[in-house]
Amino acid sequence: MIKWMTGALGAAVVCAVASLGVSAQQNQMSFFVTSVGSGMGANLGGLTGADKHCQQIAAAAGAGNRTWRAYLSAAAAAGQPAVNAKDRIGKGPWMNVKGVVVAKTVEHLHSDANNLNGETALTEKGGAVAGNQHDILTGSQADGTLQTGGAPCGNFSEATDGTGAANVGHVDRRGGGQAPTSWNASHASRGCSQANLVATGGNGYFYCFATN
């Protein structure tokens, strides 16, 4: 009886330590790829809706103590100036859910020396993005500024089939397009609907960065 209780207590301690380890990793997480999109293609409810999505799924993963922002750019509209993705994500450094640093600063993030790739750009749950869903919405150029050619899918508020476009990056740094190894500006999407994004290797995912 005593031996059984000792064994059970030991197992409980191991589980508790493991749980604390996972919790600590989630608390230090400051970067992730969304494990789910809006389900409405590139219509994310604008940048505000995308930020809310980041915050909600981060909170569900135990990292809601941080302020999260979507890595998205938007064109000037309704009296508001254009927004560059690089200007809205804080200063860094940024770590994934496992504590691996993907970039130290904004400059490092947008350089060839960053550590963002298919093995490190994990979801908030710690999973890797499937290769056939590697297109990540950004609406940005490689330097983190707004894409050329107009508002990205109505500033991420439209999901019209076959109309409009938003730049996407390849999270695994491979594939086709004009710049297949770019994590944030590989090519433009072929429309803004969910079907359009899926057809070219995406699923409406985007990057989330903690600003603090």
What annotation goes with each model-predicted range?
Residues 1-10:
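Bacterial N-terminal signal peptides that target proteins for export
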Residues 12-13, 32:
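Charged/polar interaction segments and conserved charged motifs
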Residues 14-22:
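C-terminal segment of classical bacterial N-terminal signal peptides
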Residues 22-212:
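Secreted/extracellular ectodomain signature
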